[in-house]
């Protein structure tokens, strides 16, 4: 069963563009300087998660195992508990988890952390993320820890580290298909004998894209023998184009690439 929940423009702005991506995303990536907090937006984040819980509740059976994903939905389990559901609920955080000293500087941090206590299992990408989570919760009065189990405020939660990866064998097999080999051969015939540095990322300030361009520029300055030899091709897929900081980083990258090409480029090399 697939259930859809329509969001109003205000919901989208407060919940998604606002608290999710203007507070949680930068804070959880240790960028407090980019966080923009608004009481209206945190209320929108609560409101939409309550709506999700209310829409989901009639569809749940007592035997269902509930698995919730990522920072947009941290309080969802708490609202499901309020609705009377005692199902086992797991949560996986797809992004990093900040150090306690960073998190404590963020508005509503204790409410967010209290929301995690409604889960039975909380999963992280790395052991460092799980350790940051444990260290913060151990500041709660009466919290105890036993290996990967935490008891806090009358709730027991288990944490785990489940790194996400790709299907290496499938990708390797795809690279050796006849179609792939033909495309590679065509590319070799067209390409000049140069060093190609290729990056593929979302257009996001957490990816270090300006730093990458600055590093390439520095390479060309300090080692001019790489001019006309090395080519940097950066593929940056646009994302969250309604969030101001993403508009700014796109402009910064366009200006940087233009400046580098203007300074070092030639008619047959950019």
Feature map (PLM): residue ranges:
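Catalytic cores of carbohydrate-active enzymes across secretory and cytosolic contexts
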Residues: 1-270
């Amino acid at each position: 069963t697939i259930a859809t929940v329509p969001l109003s423009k205000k919901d989208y702005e407060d919940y998604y563009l606002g608290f999710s991506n203007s507070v949680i995303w930068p804070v959880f990536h240790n960028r407090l300087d980019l966080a923009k907090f608004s009481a209206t937006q945190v209320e929108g984040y609560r409101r939409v998660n309550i709506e999700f819980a209310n829409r989901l509740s009639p569809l749940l059976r007592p035997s269902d195992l509930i698995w919730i994903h990522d920072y947009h939905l941290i309080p969802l389990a708490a609202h499901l508990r309020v609705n009377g559901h005692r199902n086992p609920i797991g949560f996986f955080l797809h992004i990093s988890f900040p150090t306690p000293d960073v998190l404590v500087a963020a508005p509503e941090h204790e409410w967010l952390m209290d929301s995690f206590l409604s889960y039975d299992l909380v999963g992280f990408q790395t052991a460092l993320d799980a350790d940051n989570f444990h260290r913060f919760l151990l500041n709660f009065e009466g919290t105890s820890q036993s290996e990967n189990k935490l008891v806090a405020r009358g709730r027991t939660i288990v944490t785990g580290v489940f790194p996400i990866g790709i299907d290496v064998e499938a990708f390797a097999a795809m690279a050796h298909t006849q179609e792939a080999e033909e495309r590679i051969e065509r590319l070799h015939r067209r390409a000049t004998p140069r060093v190609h540095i290729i990056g593929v990322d979302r257009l996001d300030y957490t990816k270090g894209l300006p730093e990458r361009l600055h590093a390439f520029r520095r390479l060309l300055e300090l080692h001019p023998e790489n001019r006309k030899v090395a080519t940097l091709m950066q593929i940056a897929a646009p994302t969250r184009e309604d969030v101001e900081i993403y508009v700014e980083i796109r402009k910064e990258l366009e200006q940087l690439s233009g400046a580098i090409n203007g300074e070092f480029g030639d008619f047959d090399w950019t």
